[in-house]
């Protein structure tokens, strides 16, 4: 099922999504951008930066409403980032507001994070892996499986907190329970559909979905009652959404000190740089927390208010967590063993690779015969002309995406018109300075193109009609004008262009 939907009619050939896609998982076909699911890692960057809003996220909201209306037992797994992204006085108000929407219960995903944290601590204690990469971020997992499969042995063989929590809830409340994850991540939607654990999460909503639904029902979170979360102590694992949150959680629960160096990386380009460094064998003996979103989950692609400071959110979350009371020992539930193991595998996209001769042939079609013809301007979305030529061969890109080539092509066409048109064509600016002058003008006005381009219109004909068009923004069509000094009768069309040259 599609995660991101493209509205073709809104796509305006700006190629901004192609430029910003770190893995170039967007193809352009018939001038319109399309996502290639096999190549996409669902970082959501294209969703954030599209200036035309041509990309929208497919929502599960109507499906969730149908579940509740059908009388299903529907439980929320609430990502801890809610503490920085929703407005409330106490966290219990959030639980109350969601239950008023019809959910049977609302639980925090940090419960599942506690199980994952324990597994990470075991891996660190065992010390058998050369490097350990956290596997909480499904976008990072997809990046490694698709583009750096050499690093799969470094991926912690552990499910994400969302999957762990889904299994926990269904174990406690029955297999027929519907679990809805609520968070800021779009890659979670694909993770929920993954055949490796497709029975754990039944739907995924983001906070925009929740806010829209609350508004529809006239529910204000700050006005709701404080209904505490009856669960195990999740406090330290609520830090997962912020940078270094996973590391902080693991360190806080370790029984004995391990020998791994620990650091975190966030942001698409930084994650790719690290992966390339690890492929080269430059990193060893490290536990690495990786998150594709710059700033962590609290800066996920569905967080529309980009002005939100991740630093302020982190401080707010830590303050909120510190105010939460430690649950009594007897409130901590005893769980049967929840399966947390996950197997990762190579999902490398198999794109055809052109020969050097084929690359040169494609480059030649856009006027790039010699290496110095390759401007590498990046306007098409690809960093080099060569990479763009490879994309053309792979049917990901089109020849006319090369803006310098299309400019030269249009200029050549314009020159051809100016040289061969049987009509006199003049282009002037608002000062009546001639910018273009067709070759046939010499026959009628006695001025060569070279001479005319050094002159103002009023130096050889009356510019009154041209000035009127500039002043009124009204065009003139089919006006008969006689020039006695040139013994010339004309039928004139004067058209205003608002393009500034």
Q: Where are the regions that the model predicts?
A:
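Terminal or standalone catalytic/regulatory effector modules within metabolic enzymes
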Residues: 343, 354-406
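PAS-family sensory domains
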Residues: 14, 43, 445, 453, ...
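Sensory modules in modular signal-transduction proteins
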Residues: 409-445
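Terminal output helix/cap of sensory domains in signal transduction proteins
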Residues: 450-491
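Short, intrinsically disordered, charge-biased short linear motifs at domain edges
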Residues: 1, 7-8, 26-28, 36-37, ...
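Conserved small/polar residues in nucleotide/adenosyl-binding loops
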Residues: 499-501
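Iron-sulfur-associated redox domains of electron-transfer enzymes in respiratory
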Residues: 58-360, 383-391
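Iron-sulfur cluster-binding cysteine motifs and their immediate structural context
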Residues: 3-6, 12-36, 41, 45-61, ...
């Amino acid at each position: 099922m599609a995660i991101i939907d493209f509205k073709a009619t809104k796509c305006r050939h700006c190629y901004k999504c192609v430029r910003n896609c770190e893995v170039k998982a967007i193809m352009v076909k018939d001038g319109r951008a399309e996502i290639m699911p096999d190549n996409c890692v669902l970082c959501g960057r294209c969703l954030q930066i599209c200036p035309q809003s041509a990309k929208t996220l497919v929502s599960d909201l109507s499906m969730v409403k149908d579940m509740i209306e059908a009388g299903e037992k529907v439980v929320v797994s609430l990502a801890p980032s809610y503490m920085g992204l929703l407005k409330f006085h106490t966290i219990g108000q959030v639980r109350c507001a969601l239950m008023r929407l019809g959910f049977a219960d609302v639980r925090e995903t940090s419960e599942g994070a506690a199980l994952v944290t324990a597994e990470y601590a075991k891996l660190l204690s065992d010390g058998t892996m050369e490097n350990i990469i956290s596997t909480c971020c499904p976008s990072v997992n997809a990046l490694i499986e698709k583009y750096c499969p050499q690093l799969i042995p470094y991926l912690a063989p552990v499910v994400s907190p969302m999957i762990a929590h889904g299994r926990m809830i269904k174990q406690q409340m029955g297999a027929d329970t519907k679990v809805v994850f609520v968070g800021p991540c779009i890659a979670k939607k694909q993770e929920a559909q993954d055949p490796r654990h497709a029975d754990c999460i039944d739907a995924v909503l983001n906070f925009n979905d929740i806010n829209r639904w609350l508004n529809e029902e006239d529910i204000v979170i700050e006005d709701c009652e404080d209904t505490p979360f009856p669960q195990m102590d999740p406090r330290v694992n609520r830090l997962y959404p912020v940078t270094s949150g996973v590391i902080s959680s693991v360190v806080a629960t370790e029984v004995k000190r391990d020998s791994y160096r620990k650091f975190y990386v966030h942001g698409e380009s930084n994650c790719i740089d690290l992966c390339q460094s690890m492929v080269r064998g430059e990193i060893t003996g490290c536990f690495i927390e990786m998150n594709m979103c710059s700033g962590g989950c609290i800066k996920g692609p569905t967080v529309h208010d980009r002005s939100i400071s991740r630093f302020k959110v982190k401080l707010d979350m830590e303050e909120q967590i510190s105010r939460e009371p430690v649950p009594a020992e007897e409130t901590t539930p005893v769980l049967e063993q929840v399966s947390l193991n996950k197997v990762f595998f190579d999902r490398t996209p198999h794109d055809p690779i052109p020969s050097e001769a084929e690359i040169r042939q494609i480059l030649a079609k856009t006027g790039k015969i010699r290496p110095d013809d390759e401007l590498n301007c990046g306007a098409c979305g690809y960093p080099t002309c060569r990479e763009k030529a490879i994309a053309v061969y792979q049917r990901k890109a089109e020849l006319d995406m090369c803006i310098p080539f299309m400019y030269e092509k249009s200029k050549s066409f314009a020159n051809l018109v100016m040289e061969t048109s049987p009509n006199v064509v003049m282009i002037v600016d608002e000062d009546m300075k001639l910018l273009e002058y067709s070759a046939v003008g010499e026959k009628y006005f006695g001025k060569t193109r070279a001479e005319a381009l050094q002159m103002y219109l009023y130096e050889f004909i009356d510019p009154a009609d041209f000035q009127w068009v500039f002043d009124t923004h009204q065009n003139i069509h089919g006006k008969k004008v006689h020039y006695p000094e040139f013994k010339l009768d004309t039928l004139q069309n004067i058209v205003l262009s608002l393009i500034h040259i």
